[in-house]
Amino acid sequence: MQAKAKIQVNTNQVGKDKINPYLFGHFVEDIRDHMDAMLAYPLSDMDFESNDVTYRGLSGSWRPFTNGKSTVFALEPAATYHSGHSQLIRIYSDDEAYAGIRQAIAVKEDQLGYELALYARASIEIKFLTAEIVDTASGEVLGATRIEIESHNWKQYASRIKVSRLCEQAEFRLYVPAEHERWRDNVSTGMLWLDHISLLPSDHVGLVRKEVVDMTKDLNAGMMRLAGNYISAYHWQQAIGPVNKRPCVINEAWGGWTNKYFGTDEFIEFCRDLQVEPLICVNDGSGTPEEAAEWVEYCNGGLDTPMGKLRAANGHVEPYGVKYWEIGNEVWGPWQVGHCSAEQFADRYVRFAQSMKGIDPEIKLLACGDDKQDWNRILLERAAEHMDYVTLHLYHGYNRFGMNDRTPKEERYKAILSYPEWTRESVRKVRELINSDSRYTHLKLAITEYNTMYYPNTIRKGLPNEHTLEAAAANAANLNEFIRNSDLIEIGSFSDLVNGWLGGCIRVGDFFADQFRGKSSGRTENALTVYGTPTYYVMNMYANRDLGYVVQSHTECGNFSVNSLVPTAPKLTDLPNLDVVACQSVDGDTLTIFMVNRSLENVVTEVLLDGFVTKGTARLLALTGEDADAFNNVHHPEAVVCEVFDVPVVNAQVSCELKASSVYVLEITRYKG
């Protein structure tokens, strides 16, 4: 028998709290390959920062490029003011050979030319270098340039390499060619040192891939958060000023190196390109209140302040005016630098808040909350007067139910689709705490990280569950819960924006399954393909609607229950197959109904409109796929995308069939005739 449902929308009953566009924000962090994928640089180990992992005297991703039998490679101290290493290449003229270094990369056609920057010094007999990009399969030189070496001392050089066509199995080479004039070998000849080599395509936008910027603009994010586990050991002054003078720093949260190229100034430029509000989380782990206050001053201070002067010296005269600041990222977790008790954090928070607001009293502060109310209770008792928002991180996966991949598939599916019920319970507990004391009622809630996370964020390979239509439907239903609680929840930050862990909704390249290794430059045949997961399209569908206030609605439909293997806090029986929320624009002229079919069968649905006069057609946005496991990849980047249809409105009623495990947005315009 065909499943049926009825949705009654009453536009005469409209909520009074406006839906904040920051609800649909996003999140960037230096985790695994997030920055490698987001930024436009094709090269790795640009400062020769990694150690010699091949035992050939070369740093990290670099490999020898020589046919000389006597060429020597070694890592030596970096150039003045630089960190990492410098790369020494010792060339013997009697070899009559070419000698240099190479690295696998992927490049696109660029007639304006990739920007090449490098530091070099050489013994006087080495007069020039060749830099080229080559198709490793055919040997075709896709572009080349000549660098004249002018000094035995360190000097910066710049050029452009025009690239004739796209090639995802390319190689960058920088070398002394065999055609170089000969010299008489001795202990001080044939010496070439290199330090900091970078390439950037001409279409980069503030160092970020143009494709990533374009896709992020389409998300209409409202707010962009800079945070994550790494921030608890992040010292902001190490990532400002000339990039070559920024130190290479170990990423204490995730291993490897922090990305020094995307610091405060680049983040603000990114936000301005997107026209979104920045949210910055400060380092309360290894950092100090004074350091956090100086960060506020760097962003917001005038030219009469020390940090304002420093910002201006770095090329940014006008203050950034960053309004939203977060103190503490998952400080309750033992994996976090600065992990502490609730009492310790509350006291620490007050010190940070007072220092930061001492610089700019107009900023809004977010305090690190927890899903465990004992933490929140102590935090609010000691620090509520110093905060504007309490934060929660709400990830949803099998661990909540004691399930794993051996649990029957349908049971796992139902568990994941119960995401909004878990969020409802978490929000309810915080709401009760806030309402329990008049000193707390000014507080709002910020969900600064959320997503499906099927398994713990540790080493794992296999199906990218977070990329599926199932995950998108769960995330959409969770967004519905955010909207239902928009009187309290004002900020949401989807985790993550690009690659990183499996949750990134914009994907660069075909790396997605290995949680541990991260990106290896040029390792695949599809390194330049940029596409969105189904959840990317959910975020796009929600954030680009004209939303003002929640409208009363009632849904009659079938239901399901979750057979959890462990006790659960929320009640997980008789859950509605359709998760629905209705909204009205501020001017009252547009009605938007978000509908998620959480069942595994199609549902014929009637939407009845009460108090909203319309005629003609409505617009139906649909995110569907062949089944719940449908996902996009580099070979089929648009297997699951949002489609738009016109549907008739007859007698204030819309009929539509909602496919299984799918997300729909019904948009209706008021008739004014």
Roles of regions detected by a PLM:
Residues 170, 201-221, 267, 288-324, ...:
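An active-site-proximal structural segment forming one wall of the substrate-binding cleft
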Residues 198-206, 246-260, 278-286, 328-346, ...:
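The substrate-binding groove and active-site-proximal loops of carbohydrate-active enzymes
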